[in-house]
């Protein structure tokens, strides 16, 4: 099945809503730094946002508001664009499910590996972020393939939450038809024969050889690179809580698989449980931020009062001096 999600800013588009493959979605964010989110399976629009550059807790508040609907899927859009999300933010933020890894404007690998290294179960999507549906060159390059039978949006979202998907980057071929791109994507569905984790050993099997397979570990470190192969096995080290795989095809197509976690039970946790488990590890505190703001206001008021008293003393001195000279 093919799912088309037409996202607009702060509006859930209802075009084709009677179709089985309709996905309610909208893009959130009208701020200067493009700190945007994509809400897939949205039932309502969260209108609140912070227009000026956001603090970590501004960002966390917005994500928490979106995550109150436990059936939706929250994606951090193009985090590398305008540093809408700083890489270090991803060590601490919770209540989201995916990162938009592939985008025409920026790719956010450092953000993804930072979140994974911090112990967050975060998956990825590819997105054309196209604002002109009549430009075939800009459609179908960055996509998300979902594996398994998903005949409606609810099942699709469920599979995405389980990481049963892959982000795809098709090479740029000028004037390539949409049908040609569709054919390539359909063929990719059968490429991955199986991925397993047995006795701390990652195994991947493909239906045909690819130009290159890379295995990535903590902090985005390259653990293994092999060329012209159709299968490999790789052991988890004591320092790796996750491993992820990248596939490079001869025609330039790139596939970014979602991570495999050493602890399968942890890999199956939902965003709310993950937030509960890790929130105590956060090095920041909303109360401290409020205290800091209050302190700044207090200092500002104190400075104004000092200046006011100083001006009054100067004014009093001028009056006294004038009075004496007149005397």
Segments from the language model and where they lie:
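C-terminal functional module detector
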Residues: 130-327
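A metal-dependent hydrolase metal-coordination microenvironment
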Residues: 1-79, 84-87, 91-94, 100-118, ...
């Amino acid at each position: 099945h093919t799912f088309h999600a037409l996202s607009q800013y702060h509006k859930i588009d209802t075009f084709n809503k009677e179709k089985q493959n309709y996905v309610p979605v909208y893009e959130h964010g009208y701020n200067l730094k493009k700190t945007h989110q994509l809400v897939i399976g949205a039932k309502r629009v969260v209108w609140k946002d912070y227009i000026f550059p956001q603090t970590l807790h501004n960002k966390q508040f917005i994500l928490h508001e979106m995550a109150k609907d436990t059936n939706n899927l929250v994606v951090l859009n193009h985090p590398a664009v305008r540093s809408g999300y700083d890489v270090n933010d991803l060590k601490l933020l919770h209540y989201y499910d995916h990162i938009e890894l592939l985008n025409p404007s920026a790719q956010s690998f450092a953000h993804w590996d930072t979140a994974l290294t911090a112990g967050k179960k975060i998956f990825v999507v590819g997105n054309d972020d196209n604002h002109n549906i009549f430009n075939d060159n800009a459609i179908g390059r960055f996509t998300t393939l979902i594996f398994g039978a998903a005949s409606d949006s609810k099942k699709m979202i469920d599979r995405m939450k389980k990481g049963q998907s892959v982000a795809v980057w098709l090479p740029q071929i000028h004037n390539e038809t949409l049908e040609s791109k569709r054919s390539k994507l359909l063929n990719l569905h059968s490429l991955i024969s199986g991925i397993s984790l047995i006795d701390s050993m990652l195994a991947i099997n493909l239906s045909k050889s690819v130009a290159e397979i890379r295995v990535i570990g903590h902090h985005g470190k390259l653990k293994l690179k092999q060329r012209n192969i159709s299968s490999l096995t790789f052991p988890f080290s004591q320092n790796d809580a996750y491993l992820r795989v990248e596939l490079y095809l001869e025609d330039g197509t790139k596939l970014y698989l979602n991570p495999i976690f050493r602890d399968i039970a942890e890999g199956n946790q939902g965003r709310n449980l993950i937030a509960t488990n890790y929130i105590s590890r956060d090095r920041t505190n909303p109360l401290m931020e409020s205290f800091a703001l209050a302190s700044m206001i207090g200092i500002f008021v104190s400075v104004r009062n000092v200046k006011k008293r100083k001006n009054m003393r100067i004014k009093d001195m001028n009056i006294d001096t004038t009075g004496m000279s007149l005397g």
